[in-house]
Amino acid sequence: MTFDENPENIFIYHYVEELISSYGSYYESNLNYNDLTLKEFSVLLRIRFQGVATQHDLVELFKVSGAYIAKLLRKFEDNGYIARKEDPENRRKKLVKLTDEGIKKTDELIEVIQNWEDKVTAGISEDEIKTLNEILFKITMI
Protein backbone atom coordinates (compact mmCIF):
# COMPACT_ATOMS: atom_id res chain seq x y z
CA MET A 1 0.00 0.00 0.00
CA THR A 2 1.34 3.42 -0.87
CA PHE A 3 0.41 6.65 0.80
CA ASP A 4 -0.46 9.85 -0.97
CA GLU A 5 2.38 12.35 -0.61
CA ASN A 6 -0.12 15.17 -0.07
CA PRO A 7 -0.35 15.72 3.72
CA GLU A 8 -3.94 16.93 3.35
CA ASN A 9 -4.99 13.44 2.20
CA ILE A 10 -3.49 11.56 5.14
CA PHE A 11 -5.42 10.92 8.36
CA ILE A 12 -4.15 12.58 11.54
CA TYR A 13 -4.23 9.08 13.01
CA HIS A 14 -1.38 8.06 10.72
CA TYR A 15 0.85 10.86 11.98
CA VAL A 16 0.03 10.09 15.60
CA GLU A 17 0.81 6.42 15.02
CA GLU A 18 4.14 7.29 13.38
CA LEU A 19 5.11 9.61 16.24
CA ILE A 20 4.24 6.99 18.86
CA SER A 21 6.31 4.42 17.02
CA SER A 22 9.21 6.85 16.64
CA TYR A 23 9.15 7.77 20.32
CA GLY A 24 8.84 4.13 21.41
CA SER A 25 11.91 3.19 19.39
CA TYR A 26 13.85 6.17 20.70
CA TYR A 27 12.83 5.34 24.28
CA GLU A 28 13.91 1.72 23.90
CA SER A 29 17.31 2.66 22.50
CA ASN A 30 18.03 5.47 24.97
CA LEU A 31 16.73 4.12 28.27
CA ASN A 32 17.74 0.67 29.36
CA TYR A 33 15.28 -0.06 32.12
CA ASN A 34 14.06 -3.57 32.50
CA ASP A 35 11.96 -2.55 35.48
CA LEU A 36 9.57 -0.13 33.72
CA THR A 37 7.71 -0.22 30.43
CA LEU A 38 6.95 2.89 28.39
CA LYS A 39 3.35 2.85 29.67
CA GLU A 40 4.55 2.57 33.27
CA PHE A 41 6.92 5.49 32.74
CA SER A 42 3.97 7.51 31.42
CA VAL A 43 2.09 6.92 34.66
CA LEU A 44 5.13 7.79 36.78
CA LEU A 45 5.65 10.96 34.75
CA ARG A 46 2.00 11.97 35.16
CA ILE A 47 2.31 11.64 38.94
CA ARG A 48 5.30 13.96 38.77
CA PHE A 49 3.51 16.59 36.70
CA GLN A 50 0.42 16.49 38.91
CA GLY A 51 2.48 16.68 42.09
CA VAL A 52 -0.01 14.51 43.95
CA ALA A 53 -2.44 12.04 42.41
CA THR A 54 -5.00 9.50 43.55
CA GLN A 55 -5.49 6.03 42.17
CA HIS A 56 -8.84 7.17 40.78
CA ASP A 57 -7.18 10.13 38.98
CA LEU A 58 -4.80 7.73 37.23
CA VAL A 59 -7.55 5.25 36.29
CA GLU A 60 -9.56 8.06 34.69
CA LEU A 61 -6.60 9.62 32.91
CA PHE A 62 -5.13 6.43 31.44
CA LYS A 63 -8.48 4.65 30.88
CA VAL A 64 -7.28 1.47 32.59
CA SER A 65 -8.70 -0.65 35.38
CA GLY A 66 -8.34 0.14 39.05
CA ALA A 67 -6.67 -3.23 39.50
CA TYR A 68 -3.99 -2.37 36.92
CA ILE A 69 -3.21 0.97 38.59
CA ALA A 70 -3.22 -0.62 42.06
CA LYS A 71 -0.71 -3.24 40.91
CA LEU A 72 1.42 -0.59 39.21
CA LEU A 73 1.42 1.69 42.25
CA ARG A 74 2.50 -1.26 44.41
CA LYS A 75 5.39 -1.85 41.98
CA PHE A 76 6.35 1.84 42.12
CA GLU A 77 6.17 1.75 45.91
CA ASP A 78 8.29 -1.42 46.10
CA ASN A 79 10.91 0.25 43.86
CA GLY A 80 10.92 3.36 46.05
CA TYR A 81 9.53 5.66 43.34
CA ILE A 82 6.36 6.75 45.16
CA ALA A 83 4.99 7.17 48.65
CA ARG A 84 1.33 6.89 49.55
CA LYS A 85 -0.44 8.64 52.38
CA GLU A 86 -4.01 8.94 53.53
CA ASP A 87 -6.06 11.83 52.13
CA PRO A 88 -6.96 13.97 55.18
CA GLU A 89 -10.27 14.93 53.53
CA ASN A 90 -11.27 11.34 52.69
CA ARG A 91 -9.51 8.62 54.66
CA ARG A 92 -10.53 5.95 52.14
CA LYS A 93 -8.41 7.62 49.45
CA LYS A 94 -4.65 7.42 49.20
CA LEU A 95 -2.58 10.29 47.86
CA VAL A 96 0.39 9.31 45.70
CA LYS A 97 3.53 11.43 45.41
CA LEU A 98 6.98 10.81 43.95
CA THR A 99 9.90 10.16 46.27
CA ASP A 100 13.37 11.55 45.60
CA GLU A 101 14.14 8.30 43.76
CA GLY A 102 10.99 8.75 41.64
CA ILE A 103 12.00 12.30 40.80
CA LYS A 104 15.47 11.08 39.78
CA LYS A 105 13.92 8.39 37.56
CA THR A 106 11.57 10.86 35.88
CA ASP A 107 14.40 13.38 35.39
CA GLU A 108 16.12 10.77 33.22
CA LEU A 109 12.95 10.26 31.20
CA ILE A 110 12.35 13.98 30.78
CA GLU A 111 15.83 14.30 29.30
CA VAL A 112 15.07 11.52 26.79
CA ILE A 113 11.74 13.15 25.90
CA GLN A 114 13.43 16.51 25.35
CA ASN A 115 16.14 14.95 23.18
CA TRP A 116 13.50 13.14 21.09
CA GLU A 117 11.43 16.31 20.71
CA ASP A 118 14.54 18.23 19.64
CA LYS A 119 15.26 15.53 17.07
CA VAL A 120 11.76 15.40 15.55
CA THR A 121 11.34 19.17 15.51
CA ALA A 122 14.83 19.99 14.18
CA GLY A 123 13.48 21.31 10.86
CA ILE A 124 10.59 23.24 12.38
CA SER A 125 10.61 26.89 13.46
CA GLU A 126 9.81 27.96 17.03
CA ASP A 127 6.53 29.48 15.78
CA GLU A 128 5.56 26.21 14.09
CA ILE A 129 6.37 24.26 17.27
CA LYS A 130 4.23 26.68 19.28
CA THR A 131 1.36 26.26 16.79
CA LEU A 132 1.76 22.48 16.85
CA ASN A 133 1.57 22.45 20.65
CA GLU A 134 -1.55 24.64 20.59
CA ILE A 135 -3.26 22.38 18.04
CA LEU A 136 -2.32 19.18 19.88
CA PHE A 137 -3.63 20.71 23.10
CA LYS A 138 -6.97 21.48 21.43
CA ILE A 139 -7.19 17.96 20.02
CA THR A 140 -6.54 16.34 23.40
CA MET A 141 -9.23 18.47 25.07
CA ILE A 142 -11.99 16.94 22.94
Give a label for each model feature:
Residues M1-N34:
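N-terminal leader segment of winged-helix/HTH proteins
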Residues G24, K75-E134:
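Charged, amphipathic alpha-helical coiled-coil/dimerization segments
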